Amino acid sequence: MPRKGSVPKRDVLPDPIHNSKLVTKLINKIMLDGKRGTAQRILYSAFDLVKERSGREAVEVFEEAIDNIMPVLEVKARRVGGSNYQVPVEVRPERRTTLGLRWLVNYSRLRGEKTMEERLANEILDAANNTGGAVKKREDTHKMAEANKAFAHYRW
């Protein structure tokens, strides 16, 4: 941590096509080795597939999917008297978004379809319908927090 106060948070520029900061953040999550153009091509192709398959605006479906993925609670390890407890804590809004995007991209990469565009599009559609790997991850995270509710008084 810096000694001289906090470091200002850099704001991302909204995406030029959809004018959405969330879309820019997703592009940054998809991007590997600094290849932004490739990441943008993947995302825009996936959005075309989403629009074609759902009949709705792709960004609307994407935002609905992210809302279904973002966790409200998570567990953090807390050491008390020689033993570690998994303590449920609320997730900050910024971290909720980050986790949602990370899980969406990671579970897209694990899917079986041939191209990344298809994988991402199908994961977005699944998440919008409350199914798919990313939503399951959120459910598992919430279950873990619920199971460890007894340790909630160890919060800090």
UniProtKB/Swiss-Prot annotation:
Domain of life the protein comes from: Bacteria
UniProt GO molecular function: rRNA binding; structural constituent of ribosome; tRNA binding
Role description: One of the primary rRNA binding proteins, it binds directly to 16S rRNA where it nucleates assembly of the head domain of the 30S subunit. Is located at the subunit interface close to the decoding center, probably blocks exit of the E-site tRNA.
GO cellular component, one term: small ribosomal subunit
Organism (species): Staphylococcus saprophyticus subsp. saprophyticus (strain ATCC 15305 / DSM 20229 / NCIMB 8711 / NCTC 7292 / S-41)
Family listed: Belongs to the universal ribosomal protein uS7 family.
NCBIfam families found in the cross-reference section: rpsG_bact
Record note on quaternary structure: Part of the 30S ribosomal subunit. Contacts proteins S9 and S11.
GO biological process, one term: translation
Xref: InterPro entries: Ribosomal_uS7 (IPR000235), Ribosomal_uS7_bac/org-type (IPR005717), Ribosomal_uS7_CS (IPR020606), Ribosomal_uS7_dom (IPR023798), Ribosomal_uS7_dom_sf (IPR036823)
CDD domains, per the entry: uS7_Bacteria
Pfam short name (any one): Ribosomal_S7
Ribosomal protein listed as a keyword: yes
Alphabetical keyword list: Ribonucleoprotein, Ribosomal protein, RNA-binding, rRNA-binding, tRNA-binding
Keyword rRNA-binding: yes
Protein name, entry field: Small ribosomal subunit protein uS7
